[in-house]
Amino acid sequence: MKLKINIRPNEIIFLICIVVIFSFSYTLTYFDSPIFKEHYITNNGNDFGVENHFVTYHSTYKEDIHKRIIDPHHGLIQEITKTFYPVSSPLEKLFSFSDNILIVLIIVQVIVGFLIFLLSVEKLSKCNYQLKSIFSTKSTFYINNNNNNNNEDINNNNNNNNNNNNKNKNDERNNEEIEDEETIRKEKILIIKKKRDILLAIIIFFLVLLGVLTIIYVSFIPLNIRKAFIGQQFYYKGSIDPLCADISNEGDHHIGKCKSLNGRIGNVNDKIFGYSWSLDSGLFNVKIVFFSTILIEFLTGCLILLMKFKKDPNIVPLTKPSIASPTQIPHLFCIAK
């Protein structure tokens, strides 16, 4: 068996582009999005001021809920800001559209993975020129018919050695049957090639669709956050306890930061702020897309390599159909190019 691996440059570029795209998308999942900016709380004597610095999207639809909690024992003031977008909001519609794309993307990935898996297994298990399809029965019929005809010809030749005219007629008939068998075999190979081209076209179509959906979904990653944004800020009126500590959560993941001259809030210039873009469920979805796409890339690469395996066409008899059998008919992806 001859092994020829001939990978074209465009195939290498295609695989590199896929890896780069999903590596970039994976990096984005751990990147702090600047969609929601910091919320500053500054000390101003016995009072405080709240400065909300949002990078607003569709501010007309945005609704804020403020809640202030004062701890009388420690003088801790907790400001909770919850920002959400109604159903009529364009951003809310964008979230829904992104979720729908994710569902379609996962479905397409399942289809592509299933097709590539089947074709890869079929390639590995049936490259011994075994054809188990509707053609096998017909092939057996034709081959058995030819074998019977050949046996009859041999008997006629043995019984009529002195009859040259009959022998010539039998030879002509055998030649015609050989030509017919070779024609039938070539037609079957042509049909097999057409089946292969159709399946490859289906795979290419789904791969292109997968790429388009993935690019669209990756472009939505910075906005693929939870529908509600919750931010918490803390302000301590005294200067006896450090405030640059963990900021507690309010039903969502948060990223909290504190900026102070001495690690405590007690001066006018000291400020504490926190921001979040909550990717708890979104991060899980992105990881699903990332790892499932890596699996699709692996299966696609295996299929591309398997498609490059070529057998010596001399193994398949082209001029002696009388000794051919169904196991000698090239299979779907085992035809030498």
Curated annotation (Swiss-Prot):
Q: Where are the transmembrane segments?
A: 11-31, 101-121, 198-218, 286-306
Q: List the disulfide bonds.
A: none
Task: List the Cytoplasmic topological domains.
Answer: 1-10, 122-197, 307-337
The alphabetized UniProt keywords are: Membrane, Transmembrane, Transmembrane helix
- Cell compartment(s), UniProt: Membrane
Q: Where is the composition biased (Low complexity)?
A: 148-167
| Entry membrane topology | Multi-pass membrane protein
Ranges of the Extracellular topological domain: 32-100, 219-285
Is Transmembrane tagged as a keyword? yes
What ranges does the record give for the region Disordered, renumbered to this chain? Answer: 148-179
Q: What is its main location?
A: membrane
A Gene Ontology term for the protein's cellular component: membrane
Write the protein's name. Uncharacterized transmembrane protein DDB_G0284909
